[in-house]
Amino acid sequence: MALIIPRSQYVATYGPTVGDKVRLGDTDLWATIEQDFLTKGDECKFGGGKSVRDGMAQSSTATRDNPNVLDFALTNVMIIDAKLGIIKADIGIRDGRIVGIGQAGNPDTMDNVTPNMIIGASTEVHNGAHLIATAGGIDTHIHWICPQQAQHAIENGITTMIGGGSGPADGTHATTCTPGKFNIERMFQACEALPVNIGFFGKGNCSMLEPLKEQVVAGALGLKIHEDWGATPAVIDAALKVADEMDVQVAIHTDTLNESGFLEDTMKAINGRVIHTFHTEGAGGGHAPDIIKAAMYPNVLPASTNPTRPFTVNTIDEHLDMLMVCHHLDKRVPEDVAFADSRIRPETIAAEDILHDMGVFSIMSSDSQAMGRVGEVVTRTWQTADKMKAQRGALGDEGNDNFRIKRYIAKYTINPAIAHGISQYVGSLEVGKLADIVLWKPQFFGVKPEFVMKKGFISFAKMGDPNASIPTPQPVFYRPMFGANAKANTESAVYFVSQASVDANIKAQYGIQKETLAVKGCRDVGKKDLVHNNATPEITVDPERYEVRVDGEHITCEPATKVPLAQRYFLF
């Protein structure tokens, strides 16, 4: 006989279900659960007097030799995912991968248990009833200036970092390239202790093919072209030829000064081949003043970096100072000041907000320590979404913000994964992918996760005083957990590399322990493949006033005077 309980009691016990709305942080974004995979009355909950115990929701007979027995069950959790939608389910993990999204439990005593989601004596359980699960974020614009960036990134929910560099050298301060086999090998060896998945760009600035190919064979997952090394048409063509031959991606920071051509010349050199454009608005660099037009092409995968996200009253002043430092400019040199002024344009930064909301800009990233903040990718994404809701209203008429939420979460999860050929491994919580999972309390969503799992093992978490009698007493701050320690760390994170480097067995050559996974399908994608962010309208820029028009309509917005997910959550 069924027991009827008030909805409020159900939500208090098992969390929200279909139709319930959940506010994300202190934003005005409300997520509504679209589907619930759990069987009412058979929910799994661990604790005193709860259901996950021997002979109830936990099988008495299933051993780990049974391939359907889970290593970890995350129960009753709300999922926000660009591919799965906004749903309620249990997440089943085995051997570091997601094996099920459905109903976990004991099929001997429960109905509708997903066949490969058995809870047994071998299964760890965490109650997710009042938590939100998202896929680990992916930041594709990392300047590897210092290794400490990895901790700040994972504390904001980033679990994959793609970029280049070799430490605090001038080349790394300005460009995201790890040049050549020696530096690539050393960086792989240096990053064994970092708790995140990592991929390195080789230096793509060379007009001959062999110096580029050898970097891909050495382990680069892609090539980065940067104007500071000379982003000429010959360089662009050579890098793309190698990329097409070796199935890697090319990322580009185009020619701000228009030294070797204008945007049209760069697009001619690209010649319809797929390319990932960095800070496509232009404040981070690129053809002045109209690099933003690149976002209208079907072969361009356009990204933003977070210092311009969202457009606020402080954005312009901050950028001028950052630019002078990052690109070794001198305020006493008029040409350097003119260079800086040409890149920082309020009109195009305002348009960038709207292009994100329209799904024209597809990817969000940091530009870590080189004008961007590595620990704010997730936060800045949701601040932009909230600002756009306030200024542009709802997207659609479904009575919630689900579509906008899915559009924005795709920008730092599945879309960068698709762009770099790693979407078969990460980028969503789909079955078969690495169990890189971020858990949030709704009130802290987008700012401070509860904990972060890497390959199904807890790597970082908010943790109280280790000498306290319980885990929660102050001071509570992020600490590395067992998943980030010793050999567990090398088992819990991976390197993304080229197939050519896997064939060359760089893992043995370099003596590294982390698994190497080859990128695939980098040359077969286009803007059409980017989830919820694949619009290709005509974009024009007034060369004197910098006004941006989309399909003939002038787009602009006011700078924000305050943003959510900010001082309410931080002391500084």
Curated annotation (Swiss-Prot):
The active site is at H327. GO terms for cellular component: cytoplasm. GO terms for molecular function: nickel cation binding; urease activity. It catalyses: urea + 2 H2O + H(+) = hydrogencarbonate + 2 NH4(+). GO terms for biological process: urea catabolic process. It is found in: Cytoplasm. Ni(2+) 2 binds at K224, H253, H279. Its main location: cytoplasm. This is Urease subunit alpha. It comes from Actinobacillus pleuropneumoniae serotype 3 (strain JL03). The gene is ureC.
